[in-house]
Amino acid sequence: MDFRLNDEQELFVDGVRELMASENWEAYFAQCDRESKYPERFVKALADMEIDNLLIPEEHGGLNAGFVTVAAIWMELGRLGAPTYVLYQLPGGFNTVLREGTQEQIDKIMAFRGTGKQMWNSAITEPGAGSDVGSLQTTYTRKNGKVYLNGSKCFITSSAYTPYIVVMSRDAASPDKPIFTEWFVDMSKPGIKVTKLEKLGLRMDSCCEITFDNVELEEKDMFGREGNGFNRVKEEFDHERFLVALTNYGTAMCAFEDAARYANQRVQFGETIGRFQLIQEKFAHMAIKLNSMRNMLYETAWKSDNGLITSGDAAMCKYFCANAAFEVVDSAMQVLGGVGIAGEHRIARFWRDLRVDRVSGGSDEMQILTLGRAVLKQYR
């Protein structure tokens, strides 16, 4: 595989470097993390570079650049300290609506292009249905030409401020044979209650519990086809897990470089700590993990661009990168010592963020189960 970037990709990566050097973004990110605030100004700056157009088809005014280009940009953003986890909806969110939505839904979401604002997300997880998605209890009921949504969702990302949520629910009229359908819900409707939850990490993107009490919808609010909810989100899960893995790599690379610079200037016992063999061992292991992550990510991106990605690929990528990246950040924190745990160094934020990613977007355990099944299926 040729790892050299083409001219278009180089332009994007150069643009990212210029943006990150244009001001002290770290101070802004630290403030947003403390205040659990979405970094809209930063995302708007990326939108001005057309980052939100990367995967949109050319017939809709997009760049159709592909996931290899997304990978190159996300890796560089992460390496330079950007919280790329707030960008998960940018590369794929528009495409999903273009593919599944009605024209009215498409118009509502495409109006957010170029704004940097949060626009929509999926609501799937419930108090009694996390990894066991088939146990969802939120229902939709048809009555007098209307559709009524009832139930609760929890740990829903971006839901504090997004104007629209796509809600997975089951048909109340079919209790014995579950029919799962998604609904495009305007969050300003009566009967919706949103409760913000505090998180250990990933604090720049909200996490909420949402309750729906007889929320009135129209048939036109259906998202995609009736009964196709699971099939639709399966593809979304695969791409989400790939993007989580990209974020993990970028964050780990940033921590690695911070620790390397520190090791080359911190003096103890009359010499820089980077000359100590135990410190060198840490960097050797970190470098091996980072190189392995990078290779896996580019391979997965290439597979996605060529229609070859499987759930097993996404699970492997997500599991390996989430764990390897956390180990890299943990080792980098050990190198930084007191600076990393008692000061205001960004490594503490990275450590919190990456620990969350071993649960969010699919737990470690579910990735292993998915991957194990996928591997054995190849030999039946």
From Swiss-Prot:
Q: Does the keyword Cytoplasm apply?
A: yes
Q: In which pathway does it act?
A: Amine and polyamine metabolism; carnitine metabolism
Task: Enumerate the UniProt keywords alphabetically.
Answer: Cytoplasm, FAD, Flavoprotein, Oxidoreductase
**UniProt keyword annotation of Cytoplasm present:** yes
Q: Which domain of life is it from?
A: Bacteria
Q: Which GO terms describe its molecular function?
A: acyl-CoA dehydrogenase activity; flavin adenine dinucleotide binding
List cofactor names only: FAD
Q: What class of enzyme is it?
A: oxidoreductase
Q: What is its main location?
A: cytoplasm
Q: What's in the GO CC field?
A: cytoplasm
Which reaction does this enzyme catalyse, per its entry?
Answer: 4-(trimethylamino)butanoyl-CoA + oxidized [electron-transfer flavoprotein] + H(+) = crotonobetainyl-CoA + reduced [electron-transfer flavoprotein]
What Gene Ontology terms for biological process does this UniProt record contain?
Answer: carnitine metabolic process
Write out the annotated subcellular location: Cytoplasm
Report the PROSITE patterns cross-referenced here. Answer: ACYL_COA_DH_1 (PS00072), ACYL_COA_DH_2 (PS00073)
Record-linked InterPro entries: Acyl-CoA_DH_CS, Acyl-CoA_Oxase/DH_mid-dom, Acyl-CoA_Oxase/DH_mid-dom_sf, AcylCo_DH-like_C, AcylCo_DH/oxidase_C, AcylCoA_DH/ox_N, AcylCoA_DH/ox_N_sf, AcylCoA_DH/oxidase_NM_dom_sf
Instruction: Name the Pfam families on file.
Output: Acyl-CoA_dh_1 (PF00441), Acyl-CoA_dh_M (PF02770), Acyl-CoA_dh_N (PF02771)
Question: What is this enzyme's EC?
Answer: 1.3.8.13
What family does the database annotate? Belongs to the acyl-CoA dehydrogenase family.
Q: What does this protein do?
A: Catalyzes the reduction of crotonobetainyl-CoA to gamma-butyrobetainyl-CoA.
* Subunit details: Homotetramer.
Q: Which HAMAP family does its entry note?
A: CaiA
Q: What is this protein called?
A: Crotonobetainyl-CoA reductase
Q: Which organism is it from?
A: Proteus mirabilis (strain HI4320)
